């Protein structure tokens, strides 16, 4: 029996648990004897708005194929972001190449105050209050990798205590 793609057209695609956001599509060209050949690169972010987010860059001769490749890569590169009360647990600087991104926690009601790339990633990770500043190069790909570097290095107070071997002190009701 041969496989025919035309038979699959009416089958519903499975719904993903992740929301997706395409940050940008880049077109490159190579000149050959007969003319130019174009290729496309797509940067896609996937997230469940509940602490899980992934990023992928797909390259292909056509835009839809590049986007599908990017989604597939993003699913494989998922990370967990510790979200406490809608914000990140502490201030951190993410670095990639010459791009640095400062990520700061913010109080309730602040919202996500950030550039396009950090805002998209934070919102798909489920962060509702955060401050961000892009330092150095503002290349979208490098900024995205820098944000992911920052998110990967975030630790909750509980994780830090476990790493240091410290037990949590009981909270007493005030100064004595």
Curated annotation (Swiss-Prot):
Residues 18-81 form the S5 DRBM domain. Keywords: Ribonucleoprotein, Ribosomal protein, RNA-binding, rRNA-binding. GO terms for biological process: translation. GO terms for cellular component: small ribosomal subunit. Belongs to the universal ribosomal protein uS5 family. Part of the 30S ribosomal subunit. Contacts proteins S4 and S8. With S4 and S12 plays an important role in translational accuracy. Located at the back of the 30S subunit body where it stabilizes the conformation of the head with respect to the body. This is Small ribosomal subunit protein uS5.
């Amino acid at each position: 029996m041969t496989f025919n793609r035309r038979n699959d057209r009416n089958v519903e695609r499975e719904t993903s648990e992740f929301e997706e956001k395409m940050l940008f599509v880049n077109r490159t060209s190579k000149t050959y004897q007969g003319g130019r050949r174009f290729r496309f690169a797509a940067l896609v972010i996937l997230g469940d708005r509940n602490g899980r987010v992934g990023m992928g860059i797909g390259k292909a001769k056509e835009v839809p194929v590049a986007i599908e490749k990017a989604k597939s890569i993003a699913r494989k590169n998922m990370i967990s972001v510790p979200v406490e009360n809608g914000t990140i647990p502490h201030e951190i600087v993410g670095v990639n190449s010459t791009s640095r991104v400062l990520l700061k926690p913010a109080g309730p009601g602040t919202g996500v105050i950030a550039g396009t790339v950090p805002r998209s990633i934070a919102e798909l990770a489920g962060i509702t209050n955060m401050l961000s500043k892009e330092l150095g190069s503002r290349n979208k790909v490098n900024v995205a990798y820098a944000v992911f570097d920052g998110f990967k290095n975030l630790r909750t107070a509980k994780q830090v205590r476990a790493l240091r071997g410290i037990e949590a002190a009981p909270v007493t009701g005030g100064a004595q």
